[in-house]
Amino acid sequence: MADTIQSLDQLSALKPAESEAPKHTKKVDKYGRAYATGKRKDAVARVWIKPGAGKILVNAREVDVYFARPVLRMMIQQPLVAAARAGQYDVVCTVAGGGLSGQAGAVRHGLSKALTHFEPELRGVLKKGGFLTRDSRVVERKKYGKAKARRSFQFSKR
């Protein structure tokens, strides 16, 4: 505390400490894959991506077999389409917990994070699309004295 400020002129002469934005670097393993974990509701997806022909495997099965509904397949493809990287990466993921919709959301979240690990410059595009944000909505717990979380038992006057 040797340098005490005596006047406002000295205060304005002080330079604020410049805080730089964090530099995002490429994070790949020894096999050239980027890894990320995605979550949605009760589902957790572990996702690995590497450059390839655009093949997507979910729990050792083709994406068309695992996610039969076209909406779920489209959901998984969204980060790749937004980043203009459709068909350029092979995706291998294992997903557990929850239902199919939650699992598709978890894979999408993990795939987005893995893309940012592989190509940090895609972070802005994916963040703008909302793919890097974990959807925190989960099922509300059941309360005592209630039929479900909020539903009351049927009222009877007599």
From Swiss-Prot:
Gene Ontology CC annotation, any one: cytosolic small ribosomal subunit
Gene Ontology terms describing biological process: translation
Entry superkingdom: Bacteria
Keywords: Ribonucleoprotein, Ribosomal protein
PROSITE patterns: RIBOSOMAL_S9
InterPro entries on file: Ribosomal_Su5_D2-typ_SF (IPR020568), Ribosomal_uS9 (IPR000754), Ribosomal_uS9_bac/plastid (IPR023035), Ribosomal_uS9_CS (IPR020574), Ribsml_uS5_D2-typ_fold_subgr (IPR014721)
Disulfide bonds: none
Recorded GO MF terms: RNA binding; structural constituent of ribosome
PANTHER family: RIBOSOMAL PROTEIN S9, SMALL RIBOSOMAL SUBUNIT PROTEIN US9M
NCBIfam families linked to this entry: PRK00132.1
Family: Belongs to the universal ribosomal protein uS9 family.
Protein name: Small ribosomal subunit protein uS9
Organism whose genome encodes this protein: Nitrobacter winogradskyi (strain ATCC 25391 / DSM 10237 / CIP 104748 / NCIMB 11846 / Nb-255)
